[in-house]
């Protein structure tokens, strides 16, 4: 429903609202402290984060969300600035279209990470989660020929690490770290695979 859509759009809108038409990064390449704090408050990170939540290099939930926004094509980083993409500007005022645009870019990563993300989406859509999901993804990746650098089968922890950017994006859309709604994660995974209209 619309409540789910608004919740799923919340983290991405928080980043887009903070960045506005574009912002200059610090000399070290981070978001300015005021914007980090704004994003942390808008996404609920400040409810559980220990510390000020105003430096991106020390506030990993905000840093990861910004990186995810770049990976799913909402932000573009170039020449010391970060700006919303044309796609982001087109959907920013429309939560459903924004969520659909993000889901269309899942899974995230390259190589085995993308495959881990795909199989994690399939598992989540089928209602799997946690250790069961990680073990299943590891087995599928191993069956498909992926190996560690040492040549051994992939572990559940390695499969989870590969799928993590995709899993984290879904968790942030389903209420965030401390308030994740597992049923919404399942619905979002299905929407990522089959389209938002098929599951909303």
Which sequence ranges carry the predicted segments?
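Short, amphipathic alpha-helical interface elements at domain boundaries
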Residues: 1-58
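Accessory beta->alpha helical hairpin/"wing" motif in late/C-terminal subdomains of nucleic-acid enzymes
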Residues: 63-67, 76-109, 157-161, 174-200
């Amino acid at each position: 429903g619309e409540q789910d859509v608004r919740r799923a759009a919340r983290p991405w809108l928080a980043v887009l609202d903070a960045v506005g038409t574009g912002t200059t990064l610090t000399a070290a390449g981070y978001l300015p402290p005021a914007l980090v704090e704004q994003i942390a408050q808008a996404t609920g990170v400040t409810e559980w984060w220990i510390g000020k939540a105003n430096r991106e290099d020390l506030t990993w939930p905000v840093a990861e969300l910004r990186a995810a926004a770049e990976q799913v094509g909402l932000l573009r980083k170039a020449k010391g600035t970060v700006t919303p993409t044309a796609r982001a500007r087109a959907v920013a005022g429309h939560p459903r279209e924004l969520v659909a645009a993000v889901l269309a870019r899942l899974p995230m990563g390259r190589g085995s990470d993308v495959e881990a993300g795909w199989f994690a989406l399939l598992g989540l859509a089928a209602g799997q989660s946690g250790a069961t999901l990680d073990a299943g993804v590891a087995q599928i990746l191993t069956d498909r020929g992926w190996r560690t650098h040492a040549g051994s089968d992939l572990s559940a922890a390695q499969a989870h690490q590969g799928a993590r950017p995709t899993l984290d994006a879904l968790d942030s859309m389903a209420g965030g770290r401390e308030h994740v709604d597992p049923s919404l994660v399942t619905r979002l995974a299905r929407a990522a695979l089959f389209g938002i209209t098929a599951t909303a």
